[in-house]
Amino acid sequence: VYKGRIPLNKYARLLGDIGEKYNFAKLAPETNDVGMTVTTILQDEGYPNLYFYTKLLRKKRKNRPEEDKFPGWLTTTKNRSVIIENLEKDIREENVIVKDPFFVQEAYTFIYDGAGRPIARGKHRMNNSSMDLDLEGETYSDDAIFGKAITNHIRCHSASNTVVIPQ
C-alpha cells in the first residue's frame, strides 16, 4: 500500500512495474485529473493491459451515437454512486476483503452528503487537491475508497477474474 505524492512519470513507471509483476495486470488510472498524464505515459511506454472506458459521441448528421474508447477510468456523476454502492455491497457480503489501512481510516469519515452523494466528510468545503480540510481543520480523503471502488467495478465486469500471484 502506498500513499503519497511522486512525480507523474515516476508514478506511471511504478504502476507499470507493479502491473508487470502481476503478469501485466489490468491498470485503470483515474483520468479525471492528472491521471490522464499517467495513462498517456503508460500508453507511450507500451503497457499492454490498460483499462479503456467507452464514451458515446454524438456526431452531426448521424442518427446513432458512435462509441469511442479512452484509456483509464473516468469517474462521473453517473457512475460515482454506483461503484461505491457496489463496493459496499461486496464488502458487506464478504465478496471482497480489504486489508488496506488507508481504506479503513478513510471509511470512518466517508459519508453521504446533503445531496445524497458519497463523499469524504468536509471534502468540498476547502479544496486542496486530493486532501481536503473541514471547518475544524482536519484533513479527509477518499482516494483509497475510490481506488478500491474502481478496482472492484473492473473486477466484477471483466471477462476473467483470474488472480495471478507474482513470482
List the model feature ranges, each with a label.
Residues 99-167:
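Charge-patterned, long linear interaction tracts outside catalytic cores
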Residues 1-119:
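Mg2+-dependent endonuclease catalytic cores in nucleic-acid-processing enzymes, primarily RNase H-like
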